[in-house]
Curated annotation (Swiss-Prot):
HAMAP family given in the database record: G1P_dehydrogenase_A (MF_00497_A)
Gene that encodes it: egsA
Name of the protein in its database record: Glycerol-1-phosphate dehydrogenase [NAD(P)+]
Subcellular location: Cytoplasm
Catalytic activity reported: sn-glycerol 1-phosphate + NAD(+) = dihydroxyacetone phosphate + NADH + H(+); sn-glycerol 1-phosphate + NADP(+) = dihydroxyacetone phosphate + NADPH + H(+)
Amino acid sequence: MSADGIKLLRTPGFDKSKWMQLPRDVVIGHNALDQFPAVCQDLKIGRSVMLFAGKSTMQVAGNRIEELLAPSFDISTFLARELTPESMKEGEEAACGVDLIIGVGGGRVIDTAKIVSFNLDLPFISVPTAASHDGIASGRASLQTSEGSASLTAHPPLGVVADTGIIAAAPHRLLAAGCADIISNYTAILDWELSNRLRGEPISEYAITLSRMTAEILMKNAPMIRPHQEESAWMVVKALVSSGVAMAIAGSSRPASGGEHKFSHALERLAPGKALHGEACGIGTIIMMYLHGGDWRGIRTALQQIGAPTTPAELGIPDEVAVAALMMAKTIRPERFSILDSGLTEESATALIRLLYGE
């Protein structure tokens, strides 16, 4: 069929363009690690591979990956101990000259692999051993600095291989935190839409729709999330990957990060080591949903069904620290508008924390 005569529709003054980077191969399920050689073959990478792992995650999954890839690849290992600028430099020096980086572990290890691969312009494959947050498939990474956690731009993984047997065997607290991180998409979207209306910030309807749908599906299935069940791990990992894709479409973490994430980062600074990222986001989501006039009780019920904390006391955090975190939250990433920027007094913040304990 000839293309002669076909007229291209060109809108006067239209100059938009969009570059999206998405994971290419995603394998989720029972014994997914066994498909690793096929994934590497499909991605057509070189022969030199470096595994980034922790001591425990090397035993959980890293050794098995080495065994599977050894016949066809030259494999080396870097133990990622801390998520700091110093460890990033060590990782970059170790990985210089390899063809592929594989991050095997939780958020710390995967973020290390993600940042190093981005800085060296190398592809990387994400192999989560727990489903505690949506960074397993996103193009964002967190780095610990002297001033707290900093959010960095990186590339999303070229592939994701998530073995539900391994993830289901991890402590349920990690899975529940991952669920809470997904549920927080609800208020992240509301903040983004509010910023669009009040500040004219551009939004992506596609990213918003995908992010909201992901949270809705998990909320609907909250009663089915059970400890150490592969079906539960399957459901949560799919949601985490979907959330990461929404961020890739948006070109930022906006579809999954709003005032509730600001609260989480503030709480991390004021009470370090007390709460997992997703746990704090879940509590923040209850508060932000109340401020938005939404179904905050429904959010709280879903978190309780999953087994995620809904009050600071459950995390061993004094209420006054949570109040201080709420007051500090708007100073975190001040360029990112959220409902917290509408004006929150300390008296109101105290009442919001008390609200968490109510009927």
